A protein has these predicted regions:
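Conserved class I S-adenosyl-L-methionine
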Residues: 1-36, 49-50, 151-153, 158
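Class I SAM-dependent methyltransferase SAM/SAH-binding core
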Residues: 39-94
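A short acidic, Gly/Pro-enriched loop at the edge of an enzyme's catalytic core
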Residues: 92-104
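A short SAM/SAH-binding and catalytic strip from SAM-dependent methyltransferases
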Residues: 103-117
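A short glycine-rich, Lys/Arg-flanked "PGG" loop and its adjoining helix->strand segment in the class I
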Residues: 119-131
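Conserved beta-strand signature within the Rossmann-like core of class I S-adenosyl-L-methionine
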Residues: 132-140
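Short alpha-helix
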Residues: 163-179
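Core SAM-dependent methyltransferase catalytic element
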Residues: 183-205
């Protein structure tokens, strides 16, 4: 279902996201890739909004299950350049070998995955991340502030209809079972957007 949504909205996606991209997301993307090097997976690359922030000298693979979104990413890559491979595949079964990547990054990916898909997706990312590597996940959550939470609840039906996304995913809950140890969780925008940093638990990925 989500794949079909993104096939449908791909040509409008950047326009729909433009106010948030300019006012909120761009600084967060810098944080997401800060200090990373080597082989990096951008899981859920979408239209390629992260491409300008890929670390110099790194080899990045961007994956997405929507050909239409990847087409937009390819156009952006052609303008910007870089050592980037774009591949159509599913985060639940990427097709990569064990221990392939030094780092795995996912920005606003897990909020579009149903609750039942959280664990298998995390397990797959843990499998393809090197034991010495790390996984960084940028995600929304409901605010603890009653007023902000109320506003987010008003927005939630539209966000679910347009993007297949939700603010109520319990991604962190599944990490230990997926073979991941949470290293750090911190908010990057108020108390609604956080970055979760995790690493494979030795012998469990």
């Amino acid at each position: 279902m989500t794949k079909h949504k993104y096939q449908r909205i791909a040509r409008l996606y950047d326009l729909l996201d433009l106010p948030f991209e300019r006012g909120r997301y761009r600084p967060l993307r810098r944080h997401l890739f800060e200090g990373l090097s080597g082989r990096i997976l951008d899981a859920g690359v979408g239209t390629g909004r992260n491409i300008p922030f890929y670390p110099a000298g790194s080899r990045v693979t961007g994956i997405d299950q929507s050909p239409a979104m990847l087409e937009r990413a390819a156009r952006r890559l052609a303008r910007i350049g870089g050592d980037v491979e774009l591949r159509e595949t599913n985060v639940l079964d990427t097709g990569f070998s064990d221990d392939t990547f030094n780092a795995v990054v996912a920005s606003f990916l897990f909020c579009v995955l149903d609750e039942t898909l959280q664990l298998p997706a995390l397990h797959e990312l843990a499998r393809i991340c090197k034991p010495s590597g790390e996984i960084r996940i940028l995600e929304y959550r409901y605010s603890d502030n009653p007023r902000k939470r109320f506003i987010m609840r008003l927005w939630a039906p539209w966000v679910r209809w347009a993007y297949g996304a939700g603010f109520d995913r319990n991604t962190e809950h599944y990490m230990p079972e997926a073979g991941l140890e949470i290293v750090e969780t911190r908010f990057l925008h108020e108390d609604i957007i956080k970055i979760i940093t995790a690493r494979p638990i030795q012998g469990q990925s």
